């Protein structure tokens, strides 16, 4: 299977058949999109995270052009994870819309999604994953969890974000979810998996902030 970036694969698995984030957890799912973009930058050593502050340390590579707007935002100055999530989730919505469009257009260019009109008045562009793309990607992730050996940083980031935003349960059985939970616990105890363990902690920090923001918006 031709793999894509973490944020592209997260989008494919998170949106529903109409090209929208699930209505019951739209805020968490959209915030997960931002977290996935940060993970792509982190995995490519474009940013570093220290004391929950994200700092750009080098130029973005061409293959991550679909998160150029996120990179430009972070390059302005170091941002805390809290500030990042608030700016993307609870300001005008312009940043999130721009990021979503970038992802959708990048997937459209490789025929991974189709572009259609959506919204109440049909004036919104939505990007719908091609049939079978979800299933193929889920099989890859399921195999990564169940087989022996280390899970790649890419797959670990994707799995963690899907899990923390409650978008994994629809694809994994209860026993498979338990297997992933066990793998995560083992990883955190393994001194040879320090980088992966740190990445899992970053995702957990981000999703904890996501939930706080969501609860604040509800109240």
Residue spans of the language-model regions?
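Short, well-structured alpha-helical interface segments that form or flank functional binding sites
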Residues: 32-36, 98, 102, 156
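Short, amphipathic alpha-helical interface elements at domain boundaries
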Residues: 1-94, 201-219
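Short hydrophobic helical membrane-anchoring segments positioned at the boundary
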Residues: 143-219
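Ordered, amphipathic secondary-structure segments that act as subunit-interaction surfaces
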Residues: 79-116
């Amino acid at each position: 299977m031709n793999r894509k970036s973490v944020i592209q694969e997260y989008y494919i698995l998170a949106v529903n058949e109409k090209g929208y984030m699930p209505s019951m957890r739209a805020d968490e799912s959209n915030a997960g999109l931002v977290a996935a973009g940060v993970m792509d930058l982190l995995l490519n050593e474009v940013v570093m995270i220290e004391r929950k502050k994200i700092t750009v340390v080098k130029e973005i590579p061409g293959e991550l052009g679909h998160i150029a707007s996120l990179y430009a935002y972070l390059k302005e100055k170091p941002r805390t994870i809290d500030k990042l999530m608030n700016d993307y989730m609870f300001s005008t919505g312009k940043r999130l819309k721009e990021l979503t469009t970038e992802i959708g257009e990048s997937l459209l260019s490789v025929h991974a999604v189709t572009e259609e009109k959506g919204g109440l008045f049909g004036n919104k562009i939505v990007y719908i994953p091609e049939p079978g793309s979800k299933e193929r990607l889920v099989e890859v992730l399921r195999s990564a969890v169940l087989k022996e050996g280390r899970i790649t940083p890419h797959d670990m980031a994707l799995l963690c974000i899907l899990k923390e935003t409650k978008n994994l349960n629809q694809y994994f059985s209860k026993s498979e979810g338990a297997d992933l939970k066990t793998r995560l616990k083992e990883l955190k105890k393994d001194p040879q998996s320090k980088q992966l363990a740190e990445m899992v902690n970053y995702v957990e920090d981000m999703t904890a902030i996501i939930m706080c923001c969501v609860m604040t918006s509800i109240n």
